[in-house]
UniProtKB/Swiss-Prot annotation:
<feature type="binding site">
    <location>
        <begin position="91"/>
        <end position="101"/>
    </location>
    <ligand>
        <name>ATP</name>
    </ligand>
</feature>
<protein>
    <recommendedName>
        <fullName>Homoserine kinase</fullName>
        <ecNumber>2.7.1.39</ecNumber>
    </recommendedName>
</protein>
<dbReference type="GO" id="GO:0005737">
    <property type="term" value="C:cytoplasm"/>
</dbReference>
<comment type="pathway">
    <text>Amino-acid biosynthesis; L-threonine biosynthesis; L-threonine from L-aspartate: step 4/5.</text>
</comment>
<keyword id="KW-0547">Nucleotide-binding</keyword>
<keyword id="KW-0067">ATP-binding</keyword>
<dbReference type="InterPro" id="IPR014721">
    <property type="entry name" value="Ribsml_uS5_D2-typ_fold_subgr"/>
</dbReference>
<dbReference type="GO" id="GO:0005524">
    <property type="term" value="F:ATP binding"/>
</dbReference>
<dbReference type="GO" id="GO:0009088">
    <property type="term" value="P:threonine biosynthetic process"/>
</dbReference>
<dbReference type="GO" id="GO:0004413">
    <property type="term" value="F:homoserine kinase activity"/>
</dbReference>
<dbReference type="Pfam" id="PF08544">
    <property type="entry name" value="GHMP_kinases_C"/>
</dbReference>
<keyword id="KW-0028">Amino-acid biosynthesis</keyword>
<dbReference type="InterPro" id="IPR000870">
    <property type="entry name" value="Homoserine_kinase"/>
</dbReference>
<comment type="function">
    <text>Catalyzes the ATP-dependent phosphorylation of L-homoserine to L-homoserine phosphate.</text>
</comment>
<dbReference type="InterPro" id="IPR006203">
    <property type="entry name" value="GHMP_knse_ATP-bd_CS"/>
</dbReference>
<comment type="similarity">
    <text>Belongs to the GHMP kinase family. Homoserine kinase subfamily.</text>
</comment>
<dbReference type="InterPro" id="IPR013750">
    <property type="entry name" value="GHMP_kinase_C_dom"/>
</dbReference>
Length: 310
């Protein structure tokens, strides 16, 4: 039996639309991510467990884990009879890389079960392909950090899909999921087809400056450059209370905040534990919409997807 855990991730990070993402893990030791188990069997089967299992498609072939198994078998050119179990701990349409968690855990578990026939680059390419079936287009800003860990910059040149960018140990990521769903496809459809020249220049300056600040170890500069002129101005209308929440967390002391992925999760970066706790408390009382919502104080998950049992 192989059991693989794949962590949540926060894509875009305001400054890097479709090209930046960070894997995150709660500081209290909770597992914020999906788990997939693969066991040898006579025929294929898929079982769904976990807090959000009831949100998965009722038709098994529509389940992305089934599609991962099917695509992996196609890649190897043979049928692989296994019993798969998806522990769905991540809310769907949350902006925390929920589909990426399932895809990464499923493909990595299959690869481990079969003795690692695929290298990491090929595996990551498959992960992007499968996640793209849900989000509507191939982009790696969730699957890459989820699989590889840390903060990842998408390269997609010279056979390099992504490379790690150094993060800041003092940064605490407060993630508030309000309990409502925003589909990635819907959030992409709301974006304009063309952008003004000054917005393109600002976006390039912010992203280049942020990467420079990460490598030159300037956390204050990096945080100040986490501005979004590409998606947030259009997507914030999908998120009730988002603008007020951003203003509130800034007043409490967050050094940066924005939409995690395509939302509705809000992320707030803090450089002090007491500030992070006060931000988390405020968001828990004011940003959550229902009982399914949650707030976690996280750090970068530098390990990425990992085998829990083998």
């Amino acid at each position: 039996m192989v059991k693989v855990y794949a962590p949540a991730s926060s894509a875009n990070m305001s400054v890097g639309f479709d090209v930046l993402g960070a894997a995150v893990t709660p500081v209290d030791g909770a597992l914020l991510g999906d788990v997939v188990t693969v066991e040898a069997a006579e025929t294929f089967s898929l079982n769904n467990l976990g807090r959000f299992a009831d949100k998965l498609p009722s038709e098994p072939r529509e389940n992305i884990v089934y599609q991962c198994w099917e695509r992996f078998c196609q890649e190897l050119g043979k049928q692989i009879p296994v019993a798969m179990t998806l522990e769905k701990n991540m809310p769907i349409g949350s902006g925390l890389g929920s589909s990426a968690c399932s895809v990464v855990a499923a493909l990595m578990a299959m690869n481990e079960h079969c003795g690692k026939p695929l290298n990491d680059t090929r595996l990551l390419a498959l992960m992007g392909e499968l996640e793209g079936r849900i989000s509507g287009s191939i982009h790696y800003d969730n699957v890459a950090p989820c699989f590889l860990g840390g903060m990842q910059l998408m390269i997609e040149e010279n056979d390099i899909i992504s490379q790690q960018v150094p993060g800041f140990d003092e940064w605490l990521w407060v993630l508030a999921y309000p309990g409502i769903k925003v589909s990635t496809a819907e959030a992409r459809a709301i974006l304009p087809a063309q952008y003004r020249r000054q917005d393109c220049i600002a976006h390039g300056r912010h992203l280049a400056g942020f990467i420079h600040a990460c490598y030159s170890r300037q956390p204050e500069l990096a945080a100040n450059l986490m501005k979004d002129v590409i998606a947030e101005p259009y997507r914030e209308r999908l998120l009730p209370g988002f603008r007020q929440a951003r203003q509130a967390v800034a007043e409490i002391g967050a050094v940066a905040s924005g939409i995690s992925g395509s939302g509705p999760t809000l992320f707030a970066l803090c450089d002090k534990p007491d500030t992070a706790q006060r931000v988390a408390d405020w968001l828990g009382k004011n940003y959550l919409q229902n009982q399914e919502g949650f707030v976690h104080i996280c750090r970068l998950d530098t390990a990425g997807a990992r085998v829990l049992e083998n």
